[in-house]
Amino acid sequence: MSLKSERRGIHVDQSELLCKKGCGYYGNPAWQGFCSKCWREEYHKARQRQIQEDWELAERLQREEEEAFASSQSSQGAQSLTFSKFEEKKTNEKTRKVTTVKKFFSASSRAGSKKEIQEAKAPSPSINRQTSIETDRVTKEFIDFLKTFHKTGQEVYKQTKMFLEAMPYKRDLSIEEQSECTQDFYQNVAERMQTRGKVPPEKVEKIMDQIEKHIMTRLYKFVFCPETTDDEKKDLAIQKRIRALHWVTPQMLCVPVNEEIPEVSDMVVKAITDIIEMDSKRVPRDKLACITRCSKHIFNAIKITKNEPASADDFLPTLIYIVLKGNPPRLQSNIQYITRFCNPSRLMTGEDGYYFTNLCCAVAFIEKLDAQSLNLSQEDFDRYMSGQTSPRKQESESWPPEACLGVKQMYKNLDLLSQLNERQERIMNEAKKLEKDLIDWTDGIAKEVQDIVEKYPLEIKPPNQPLAAIDSENVENDKLPPPLQPQVYAG
């Protein structure tokens, strides 16, 4: 997969992300550019060719040995009887060895050896009882999920149980062969549900996700970064490579992200967190989910910076920058684990497959990164790699202090503190003003109440002259009109 470095940044033709056989699915560097389906076909063909070539070589060597032995027998007919008996004994031993090897590969021998392996490797009841809490939880969730599918769920559970019981006896196989067994299991279960169970595709996908979660939670510690592979060696190599490239700046990669914008800076931190969190997950689908979340944070950061949707040419350089800045633990082991044991349909299509393929491209670019990729001279690249100097140091010497990333962040924080101080002083002044207004308002209300009380007292004073009773003698009653004049009755 060719990676091009141009003035506007790193560019990868989107067609190069697809399977090189032209089937339309996403390819993978671990599969030599093929998709999962085409890679398995090519792998089987290559394996059959290798077996045929090995068989032909063995037959040719056997014929040459027999011819050489026959020739030596005819030329040494005059030798002593003792030597002839010695040769005869040697031939008998060789024949016996060949017979033993043939018996070993016979059906009865395979059955016997399998029985011995089962007796030797069958897990004891005590080991079965020592299951982790997470495994028990996942198993319970898996059973509860399958209950909703009735007969299909029972069949799926039966097949899954048989697969898990058979895997411990395959640990002597190479990790590629164990991966092939797992991929065959995925394919057989999915095909059986579609053909026999007539299960809709969307439900098949959900069931396959639960199957993957169930079996890989149980097999994780046996198949992730096994000792028989060089995964750990590759992890150390890529970590060392990333540490050596600590001097690479976003400008060299033409990363369209401005980390001075707070929202963008937050997105970058979240993207790094997600790519690092990938190592803590057990299920391939969960690891892919971390890659997908990381990629979406990258797209959001680019969108905020450019005020427009991000393109694929913007995404890949930024993903490379995130990987360099985060240096995720056991990166190669996680990529290999996903490649070997993830449901292949998830890697061949969809956003998960697209983002995973881009991550593989980013790692491949980092491994092959050179001076031309960064638009640098070979001399500068060598000096940066050797640690003699750093572009960040040169920038700090030639630029004003506020241009350095660390100093710039410090000034930014000081500016924020200054703004907070101004806001606090403004709030304090407003609070004091409010307090004074409340005091003035209280005094004003008290004065108004006092004035009203003085003007309209609450206590009613008795009148200076007594009030005239209606039946009392009043000289002024005569002045009233006749209807209103009081009448006096003698009691």
From Swiss-Prot:
Coiled coil regions, renumbered to chain: 407-448
Keywords of this protein's UniProt record, alphabetized? Acetylation, Coiled coil, Cytoplasm, Endocytosis, Endosome, Metal-binding, Phosphoprotein, Protein transport, Transport, Ubl conjugation, Ubl conjugation pathway, Zinc, Zinc-finger
Q: Where is it chiefly localized?
A: cytoplasm
Matching entries from Gene3D superfamilies are given as: 1.10.246.120, 1.20.5.4770, VPS9 domain
The Phosphoserine modification is found at 124, 132, 373, 377, 390
Disulfide bonding pattern of the chain: none
Which residue intervals make up region (Interaction with ubiquitinated proteins)?
Answer: 1-74
**Zinc finger (A20-type) locations?**
13-47
Q: What are the boundaries of the region Disordered?
A: 66-85, 462-491
Where does the record place the VPS9 domain? Answer: 232-375
Q: Which InterPro entries is this protein grouped with?
A: DUF5601, VPS9, Vps9-like, VPS9_dom_sf, Znf_A20
Task: Report the PTM annotation.
Answer: Monoubiquitinated.
Q: Which GO terms describe its biological process?
A: dendritic transport; establishment of localization in cell; Kit signaling pathway; mast cell degranulation; mast cell migration; negative regulation of inflammatory response; negative regulation of interleukin-6 production; negative regulation of Kit signaling pathway
Q: Where in the cell is it found?
A: Cytoplasm; Early endosome; Recycling endosome
Q: In which tissues is it expressed?
A: Expressed in the white matter tracts of the cerebellum, the fimbria hippocampi and the corpus callosum.
Q: Mind telling me which SMART domains this protein's record contains?
A: VPS9, ZnF_A20
N6-acetyllysine-modified residues are 151, 170
**GO cellular component assignments:** cytosol; dendrite; early endosome; nucleolus; presynaptic endosome; recycling endosome; vesicle
Q: Which residues bind Zn(2+)?
A: 19, 23, 35, 38
Query: Which residues fall in a compositionally biased region of kind Low complexity?
Result: 69-84
Task: Offer an example of a GO molecular function term for this protein.
Answer: ubiquitin protein ligase activity
Function, in words: Rab effector protein acting as linker between gamma-adaptin, RAB4A or RAB5A. Involved in endocytic membrane fusion and membrane trafficking of recycling endosomes. Stimulates nucleotide exchange on RAB5A. Can act as a ubiquitin ligase.
Per UniProt, subunit arrangement is: Heterodimer with RABEP1. The heterodimer binds RAB4A and RAB5A that have been activated by GTP-binding. Binds TSC2, GGA1, GGA2, GGA3, AP1G1 and AP1G2. Interacts with RAB21, and with 100-fold lower affinity also with RAB22. Interacts with ubiquitinated EGFR. Interacts with RGS14; the interaction is GTP-dependent.
What protein am I looking at?
Rab5 GDP/GTP exchange factor
- Classification lineage: Eukaryota, Metazoa, Chordata, Craniata, Vertebrata
Encoding gene per record: Rabgef1
